[in-house]
């Protein structure tokens, strides 16, 4: 049996969600999906469970007067990949702690630009708090993609879309379907369900693109702050925890899973080493951007996550306990 599924059987549900082409955002998790471990609403967002155990209705929250709710913006960690059920995502845990609605605006594999656009497209009321729980994907996607734009960033599936448009195979009849097939293949390789003969290759050195990554981050946070100020909402940035960035004693489960994933797809190990090399500069630069923009910055790569407890199902995504600790960290930092 797949060791990942043996130790974390809920991952099967996440791998089955799928994705669809979405205007402006390129792609998004499929809507109206219902599995034992994860469900999505009509917008493709994961359902948040309130403190009474009920699903929070996004439309109802947006239609009510006042701003007594929060939004968590990010990618797969906010989505809650790895959690055993909807109750254990960060937004659900915050809803339990605060007894107020926290909406899950996490979409898997998004960069900071997509996160900002995602909020712009779906925000229809004034939240009290906007939390950005992010940081890993801008760096990761720059490593995986052929190039990084100081305007458009690097996005998941970019190389496949670029190849499709530039290919002789491109035509009005097949371009979109072919692109989606390639993006799906890339996603399956990412989660380890299929292999790529080039997996062990180091895609590129991002030194030349590093400033572009930071430019996109600063632009996106600037835009998010403008949105927050316009709605009289607080905005806070939390650097998400990454096993590679922590001085963590790995649990036996983490050791098994990381070794299994590295053997299954050698590029995981290469990526982990790459992210580790940029750790100190990246933390400092993102914090400096937040200080420049007047956005509170917190880093979860701290002693909170350095115990030998099982906190990660892979180097990015967490267990129920990992997400609970993240929610408590956020609640404590914001004095919720």
Task: Please place each PLM-identified region on the residue numbering.
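Serine-dependent acyl-ester chemistry module
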Residues: 137-284, 308
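Serine-esterase "nucleophile elbow" of acetyl-processing enzymes
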Residues: 43-108, 113-127, 131, 323
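N-terminal secretory targeting modules
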Residues: 1-70, 125-126
